[in-house]
Swiss-Prot record:
<dbReference type="InterPro" id="IPR001405">
    <property type="entry name" value="UPF0758"/>
</dbReference>
<comment type="similarity">
    <text>Belongs to the UPF0758 family.</text>
</comment>
<feature type="binding site">
    <location>
        <position position="186"/>
    </location>
    <ligand>
        <name>Zn(2+)</name>
    </ligand>
</feature>
<keyword id="KW-0482">Metalloprotease</keyword>
<dbReference type="InterPro" id="IPR025657">
    <property type="entry name" value="RadC_JAB"/>
</dbReference>
<dbReference type="GO" id="GO:0046872">
    <property type="term" value="F:metal ion binding"/>
</dbReference>
<dbReference type="InterPro" id="IPR046778">
    <property type="entry name" value="UPF0758_N"/>
</dbReference>
<dbReference type="GO" id="GO:0008237">
    <property type="term" value="F:metallopeptidase activity"/>
</dbReference>
<protein>
    <recommendedName>
        <fullName>UPF0758 protein XAC3915</fullName>
    </recommendedName>
</protein>
<keyword id="KW-0645">Protease</keyword>
<feature type="binding site">
    <location>
        <position position="173"/>
    </location>
    <ligand>
        <name>Zn(2+)</name>
    </ligand>
</feature>
<keyword id="KW-0378">Hydrolase</keyword>
<feature type="binding site">
    <location>
        <position position="175"/>
    </location>
    <ligand>
        <name>Zn(2+)</name>
    </ligand>
</feature>
<keyword id="KW-0862">Zinc</keyword>
<dbReference type="Pfam" id="PF20582">
    <property type="entry name" value="UPF0758_N"/>
</dbReference>
<dbReference type="InterPro" id="IPR010994">
    <property type="entry name" value="RuvA_2-like"/>
</dbReference>
<feature type="domain" description="MPN">
    <location>
        <begin position="102"/>
        <end position="224"/>
    </location>
</feature>
Amino acid sequence: MHIHDWPTHERPREKLLARGATALSDAELLAILVGSGLRGQDAVQTARDLLHRHGPLRLLLDRPAKALTRLPGLGPASACKFAAAMELAQRHLMSALERGEALSDPPSVGRYFSQRLRARAYEVFAVLFLDNRHRAIAFEELFTGTIDGADIHPREVVRRALLHNAAAVIVGHNHPSGNPEPSEADRAVTKRLLDSLELVDIRLLDHFVIGDGRPVSFAERGWLE
C-alpha cells in the first residue's frame, strides 16, 4: 500500500503538520526525507529497513552524502536531503551559541557537541571557548586518538583559552563505543583541567561525554563543584 492510500492522520507529513515532529517515529521522520520507497515498499518501510540494516540512527545520519547514495532506497536527492538536514541542525545550534542564547539551555550545548563529535570513529576532545557573558568565541578540536589522562594536556587548553581571551570553557569528548558513561580517566583528567583553569581564573562550566543517546554532563552530576 502506498502512503497516499493511508488514512490522512497516519501519513508522516500530515502527522507532522498536525501534531509536530516529536510525534513521529524515527522511521516516519526518515520517510519524509526518503520521499518514495523501493519498488513494492512505502517510504516508511524503506526507512525501517535502513534503520534495521544500517542503524542505529546516529550512524545512518552521520554518514557522508556519497556513502548514503550507496544504500538501497537512497539516491542522490535523498542523500543530499539527509546531509542538508544534519548541517542545518548543526548550524542552528551554533547560531544559537553565537547569539549567547543556548547557554541558558545546557542540553542544547550538549546536542551541539553531539553533532560535532558523535560520528567520529576515534576519540576527539574539543573545547568551546566563551566570553565573560558566556557567549561562544570559538570551538576547537584539540586532541585526538585514545583519550586518557596522558593524552589531554591542560596547559594547551589554558594556552588556547588565554589566546581567545576566554572567561570560561565547556569541553567535550566522544566515546566511539557508544557508551557515554565517563571513565575514571575521564574524571581524573577533568579534575586536572579544572585545577589548571582555576589558576588563571577561567571557569570550566561543563564536560560532556558523547555516545549514543543523551550526552552525560559532569555539571549535572555535580562533578565540577
